[in-house]
Amino acid sequence: MLKTLLGDPNKRKLKKYQPDVVEINLLEPEMQALSDQELQSKTGEFKRQLEQGKSLDELLPEAFAVVREASRRVLGLRHFDVQLLGGMILHDGQIAEMKTGEGKTLVSTLPAYLNALTGKGVQIITVNDYLARRDAEWMGQVHRFLGLSVGLIQQSMPPQERQKNYACDITYATNSEIGFDYLRDNMATSMAEVVLRPFHYCVIDEVDSVLIDEARTPLIISGQVERPTEKYLRATAIADALQKEEHYEVDEKARNILLTDEGFIEAEKLLGVKDLFDSQDPWAHYIFNAVKAKELFIKDVNYIIRGGEIVIVDEFTGRVMPGRRWSDGLHQAIEAKEGLDIQNESQTLATITYQNLFLLYPKLAGMTGTAKTEEAEFEKIYKLEVTVVPTNRATGRRDLPDVVYKNEMAKWRAVAAECAEFHQAGRPVLVGTTSVEKSEVLSQLLNQAGIPHNLLNAKPENVERESEIVAQAGRKGAVTIATNMAGRGTDIILGGNADYMARLKVREYFMPRIVMPESDDPLAMMRIMMGDGNASGGQGFAPQGNRPQKTWKASPNIFPTKLSRETEQLLKAAVDFAVKQYGERSIPELQAEDIVAIASEKAPTEDPVVQRLREAYNQIRSEYETFTHQEHDEVVQFGGLHVIGTERHESRRVDNQLRGRAGRQGDPGSTRFFLSLEDNLLRIFGGDRVAGLMNAFRVEEDMPIESRILTGSLENAQRKVETYYYDIRKQVFEYDDVMNNQRRAIYAERRRVLEGEDLKERVLEYAERTMDDIVEAYVNPDLPPEEWDLNSMVGKVKEFVNLLADLEPQQLEDLSMAEMQMFLHEQVRIAYDRKEAEIDQLQPGLMRQAERFFILQQIDTLWREHLQAMDALRESVGLRGYGQQDPLVEYKSEGYELFLDMMTAIRRNVVYSLFQFQPQYQPPEEMPSEVV
């Protein structure tokens, strides 16, 4: 009703941008008439106009017109009008919802270029290393052509490389790299170690994945803490002995377990202890984790075992996350369950959530195919508006009604039958599954039916071929099984992706001859040591010993035809020429990937190696296109890509992402969900209603049920889950917000010290406040002065400031409280000047170094302890909800007290340490524990 009266708010927003679109289109002929050099000189011109006081908004039409023309020349891609709209929405600091295949990656070049003109840096965030590298190589060419520098951050880069790349005008990186660099920068001991520049503007690709799906997971940098291994092993044995329902209850919804009274008694009996919570010998934590590991963490669903280690599988993307570990001893409990070596537990040194990390940017924007369902959350937490960008062509996708089966096996048989039917008809099929385990069940069924298919899940042998598999998922009769949204960012083109195939063919010949052995490549060695599991786009691995040896050979059935002799000769000659120029196996892998990327595009180049490779690439592509174009037309006639969902996800948004794979850019396509009454979503959130329905439907197993009530139940369950998780995220955000204010304060203080701003004044301020604290502790203004304990007070002052050994209580006798404080301020300043002269006599400037060292040391040590105290506080206030107190209010007030105590302790410890400091390394005296 309101929409009819007021008009669609989204349309109103888009209308606002229309005049700029018209102006950019009018500028197009003028831009096309410019030479390359004239087009490139526009960048300097824009920068000068900004210096003269012009705003970015005033420059927007011409700057966008320049980028559009540069992209046409360099990449052969011209921005559609809807892509210009997307660019304006991003420049305004909003979220642009653009459907799959509408060229989101190209859209980001517009606001990135415009905002980079300020010289303050722009960061483009993608969800994995492979996409960051692909976009930096591909879209980076437009920016480089226009004279801007482009940086790329990869998982294994050393700090100097990171610094150099962050200093570029535009930097491509993943969300986790930015997050961990931010935390590491705030643990640096000198400015030379800091890699990030101040945050300015950031565009997040797949913004829903980063700001919503991953918002619940904090980023944590931790240090090792030794804990007794046998405790984990005994706890696992006890968990195995305890019975579900009788000894403990499982809350799948909250992913938690609760021991019953019988459970506590049984565990204490088996362990031979009186109390699981005994502070001298605590067991509760170990037992809870062991039961969680037994009931809630399933092999091949939540984790896989690789190389004798537990590797986490990301529940949202289905990708493995090497190097990440669950905290609080949970990872160790799972290692014990699986009989693997138990590694040390970790202690948090620094932590932040993505929510608070990205709120540090003064200007933030994002793009995704699916944001509208979470619009309220984006606006509430991030103050980000969502604007839907219309598609360039109307979609040709049909969403067919869900079919529901009584049990899971019947559902899988039906999915396999549908795959077989479409495969026979020549239509490509993409099946989305929710776990590694499920994808393998379906794969077995298809093998039994003799249907060739590609499997894409978190297993290491599949990850490396990820984009190769996705790029060919649109071939005639292709059947592809993918876990969740693996392969996000690679388009499924009907009939196959000729550009991608040609690039693979060039890599296959070029890489083995040109890439230096891993032992000579420091980046590659770092990746091996850190266990890089990111889809690097490196195809084809042949096993050799423990470490697979790279071969770069793509599977032969990828290519639609063998190359003609002339084309193969051309490719070999180009590779020989490259080897002659660079030397055999002489350049690092990332650099070689860059050469292939540039050769596969249209950017003007003076490099003879790239020119020769490009000539070969173009010829290979045109040979492949003869086949793929023909196949494209056939597949379109058959009805396009058919997408099958095999379970409703916890969020409707993830379902929509899967559906969005079909019918890109106006192609035909269809989607259907196959469900069973045993699916997690229905089981956990659909509750008893579904159980009742199961009994009501007295049907054969293989008969599908189509029912309005059931579909309603599903929608309801999804809404419930979305609300449930939104509440959790909101709670995480509210609690973390308390920590966030404290984190900002402590990191700001730390940065001032790192930059060496007025260190002496800072320490003197610490000393004066410590003197004030001592006076307040010993002097009660409500009592007559003769009752003040001046002896003890002077004793305490001397403990902190040993250079005031001559101070006598009589000197303070006739002073008021305020005068005492003033007197001690003077005394401590005199003492500090003496100390400084004494230290600087040994080595000039040593006192400043000592100040920096002690302040940083105290901040880091006490902040680490504070994080643990805040964690413990958060757990304990949770229980107060039962006592009619608001846990959040309690957490805020007590957390603030803890923070003030920490700041006081930092000040006192620094003052004490500096006055005790003896560079000849004499052992310092015992530190006084408290002012009183």
Swiss-Prot record:
GO cellular component: cell envelope Sec protein transport complex; cytosol; plasma membrane-derived thylakoid membrane
Quaternary context: Monomer and homodimer. Part of the essential Sec protein translocation apparatus which comprises SecA, SecYEG and auxiliary proteins SecDF. Other proteins may also be involved.
Binding-site residues for ATP, renumbered to this chain: 83, 101-105, 491
Keyword Membrane recorded: yes
MF terms (GO), sorted A to Z: ATP binding; protein-exporting ATPase activity
Subcellular location: Cell inner membrane; Cellular thylakoid membrane; Cytoplasm
Residues that span the membrane, as ranges: none
Function according to Swiss-Prot or TrEMBL: Part of the Sec protein translocase complex. Interacts with the SecYEG preprotein conducting channel. Has a central role in coupling the hydrolysis of ATP to the transfer of proteins into and across the cell membrane, serving as an ATP-driven molecular motor driving the stepwise translocation of polypeptide chains across the membrane.
Biological processes per GO annotation: intracellular protein transmembrane transport; protein import; protein targeting; protein transport by the Sec complex
Topological category with respect to the lipid bilayer: Peripheral membrane protein
Organism of this sequence: Cyanothece sp. (strain PCC 7425 / ATCC 29141)
Name the record gives this protein: Protein translocase subunit SecA
GN (gene name): secA
Matching PROSITE patterns: SECA, SECA_MOTOR_DEAD
